[in-house]
């Protein structure tokens, strides 16, 4: 028996207990301070006096505020040699990572910059993952003007959330970086490195991360990371690799000066090899007061590779002429194999565990539990699928603006063109067993499908802006735009079981899946008219917009009116059905009012109102059934109406004295003719038929939010932050019909999110305690459905202690609780404990050795629970469990001395 992991566990436990019992001693870090208006500190020279051998220095603050900018001091946050920027976000009041995305005061951060330029344009996560904390001087968070407003000098009140990372000037002109090599138990490894050099007008950053510890992000076809990807532990067993390069160069002139030229870009290769296992349980509530239960068990294995390159060229040709060009290219290769077992029951189970699915798999012929007092099995499905998809994507963006006069008459052009080509080959082998029907069913016992799909998507848009200064206004802007969207896909689909032989037997073809017939003419015999499809979607738009922009004494107002002429056409040729060629001419209208009032004393107020109309996609009006999934038939509706939306929001934010930050917002949305689905479930066959319909009387939503953070002492040794989000939605929904047609009922949805956290620096201690609660409930006007609710609570505790001899001990304990009213939660309690010990060596502490222990209690998974209008859900995904890893971390610099 290998006792090495157990000995490591014991050692870490003893050290953790020691750190909890050690006596805290407060000390002051001697260093420079940052002058701030809000704290009214005196200049450094006045605060630091020469007292012979002794020097008195003020305490380093975690952050200071300058008007609407918050500046976080990285050296005051207690970073270790191995910490990256993302590891320090939780210690910065006002910043948080939520669902993998970075937020500032409750708003999503759209740009992460390094010394004022984007680290990687369009991606806010690369800098968080790859910038080591020790080379960072400070981090600035603020709301900024858009690039277009900066160039034109016309501010319409739009702002974007920006995080600007300022590097330490002592590394100016030198190469700095770090290398982290780690290997551990259970064959876990993590290798990552970063190298960076920068001057006043250039920067080059090279990075690479390679790991199988489950730290990854998922990406879109365009090569961009999904907002919910996130760094951290993913589900399943994942190998993740991400080498890349980011750079910037300008000719030394200041932005806005004649002749200014800058080029910045990035490129890289990303790989994700993923092996996952998950279980899901869904209960649907029917109109007769009963329910159906669906259980799924799935294993997947996939590989994803992304090659990407981005470039941006900026040129201020003259003081009146500006040009920006941004090309992009990416290629995404995705291969997937999955195995799924799924069953449905008419009714529910007392414990709602997964034992009924396991038992049914052991008795697939007779079915179990069948005709029991609790539930009746109606369908068992076994599925094996393969997919091989490649996608090329290229995009070109051009922006040109020309000032025409001294009083800023201006003509601008913005053009964007994008093209995507995709090619996918897919095999899908499904076997169905039905228990409740004795008559012929529309669901066949076996589906052995093969399809080849080629798609071409083309987007082209041009906008011309004319800005005219008018007395009393900053600008009157007229905009004409034209847009073309064209999507064409051709899918050739086949039912291989129609060829007989091994193709018509699930168990015989399972080891051969992906193998195609070799005899001539098999395509004609096996052709599948339900999935063979030639689809062309075309949309042409001409838009006319005018803006009245006013700005004076901190008040900015933008009133806009937009009218768009739209022509939509769909060519829908499906199998043996008659071709459909629907088209539509329509007009869409949008009215917008955006106001912003900024003051230095009482903060910033914002108000916006927007009204707009939108058409349902023509594809939703197609009445031919979508039978890609035999158990779920989808129908369109040619009578769908135009949607109308009213949206208003009010916001306020202020940076107060002594580092306090406060922001709040209220949004109200009303929409009419919202598109939803009306469903009918057949208890005998297990088939659900859905149809798209408009909801009458509309629905509305009210969502307030509040964010507050404050130091609890003058030295900012202890900081508190909190956020509250609430959402109230009131509207109508359809029951799931089974004994009769689905009926409308009123429903009210409440969702509450509360977060509070305390971070403290007490001498050699760095402590953090965060708690997040989320509660959701749905109340219904019908007696058929009970009210449902779900609850989630996550408590996160972090501790860091610096021992003698440059040794640092860290521990993180996260405890989660999940609850679903009347429903089963797979793992209602989960506690994850991570810990590490880091020892620095050499005179400059450039070498460190870290012993990391992950998931000491071996409870990591991804448990999810939720409620919806007509259902509740519980899910579980496997994760990387307990491992111990030894790291060697070396940081280097070519700077002498």
Language model features with spans:
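Bacterial N-terminal signal peptides that target proteins for export
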Residues: 1-10
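Bacterial N-terminal signal peptides
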Residues: 10-19
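Sec/Tat signal peptide C-region and signal peptidase I cleavage site
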Residues: 20-24
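Short, acidic, small-residue-rich periplasmic hinge/interaction motif at the N-terminus
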Residues: 26-78, 97-99, 105-109, 143, ...
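Periplasmic plug
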Residues: 101-149, 162-169, 202
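Primarily recognizes Gram-negative and organellar outer-membrane beta-barrels
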Residues: 122-125, 145-187, 202-656, 660-897
